[in-house]
From Swiss-Prot:
Compositional bias per record (Basic and acidic residues), positions renumbered to this chain: 120-136
Protein's name in the database: Uncharacterized protein C17C9.11c
One Gene Ontology molecular-function label: zinc ion binding
Origin superkingdom: Eukaryota
UniProt keyword list: Metal-binding, Zinc, Zinc-finger
Zinc-finger among keywords: yes
Zinc finger (C2H2-type): 3-27
Length: 240
């Protein structure tokens, strides 16, 4: 049986060859024919084989060039993506460093402002204590009566300073200032309770001073404040 492709006039020796031809060319119009398939001479077969080889070689070269171009394109896309990713990473790092720098500057400014406030409070406390001493000395001079001693008798006089009966503490927390006065016999625990009530926080478990730097934990919370070196007045920072 010989089949002829009506679309390209090619003669095919079997149904299988027609199916193969249809697969390669998408031709689907065939009919039986009485024509005979001309047998090729050895030279024609050789030329046909050589032509097929050339076509296969050309096809392979085209595929190689296409693959190379595709590889170049993919490399450019990848390189561009990597550049964009690296640029985005650098931008994020720069922004993070800028935020850190701003935080450091803000913290330094807040520390300087806090130090300024504490120094001002210490200066006010010094002036207040100096004024209290001046008033006390003036009162002693005004109320002291002269004592006459017999001639040739040894005389002596003593002046006893009355210890403070209360402590005055300036509590600094989160931008708030709370001044609390407690009796000299009261403890740091009682002071902590007053801090909690007046500043609407939980009772602190520790107090610190900045000038001079010192800390007072729960191990001294039950001691009277007049037994601690922060008496009679101090600027305290509560901690939890």
């Amino acid at each position: 049986m010989v089949l002829k492709c009506l679309e390209c006039d090619k003669l095919l020796s079997s149904i299988e060859m027609a199916e193969f031809h249809s697969t390669k060319t998408s031709h689907d119009q065939f009919e039986e024919t009485e024509e005979e398939i001309k047998k090729r001479s050895p030279e024609e077969l050789k030329q046909a084989i050589e032509a097929l080889r050339e076509k296969a070689k050309e096809k392979k070269e085209k595929e190689r060039i296409l693959a190379l171009e595709e590889k170049k394109t993919n490399y450019k896309i990848l390189q561009k993506s990597n550049d964009e990713t690296a640029q985005a990473m650098r931008k994020m790092q720069d922004q993070a460093r800028l935020r850190d720098l701003q935080k450091i500057r803000q913290q330094k400014a807040e520390d300087a402002e806090q130090r300024k406030k504490i120094l001002a409070e210490i200066e006010r406390d010094k002036k207040r204590r100096a004024a209290e001493r001046e008033n006390k000395n003036s009162s002693v001079k005004e109320t002291a009566a002269p004592i006459k001693q017999p001639k040739n008798a040894n005389s002596s006089s003593t002046c006893t300073r009355t210890p403070p009966t209360s402590g005055r503490f300036s509590i600094r927390h989160d931008g708030q200032v709370c001044n609390i006065t407690i009796a000299a016999e009261e403890t740091l625990r009682q002071l902590a309770q007053q801090v909690a009530e007046k500043m609407n926080v939980s009772p602190p478990t520790k107090f610190t001073t900045t000038f001079p730097r010192a800390s007072y934990g729960t191990d001294v919370f039950d001691k009277p404040v007049n037994q601690l070196d922060l008496f009679p007045s101090a600027v305290l920072i509560p901690q939890w």
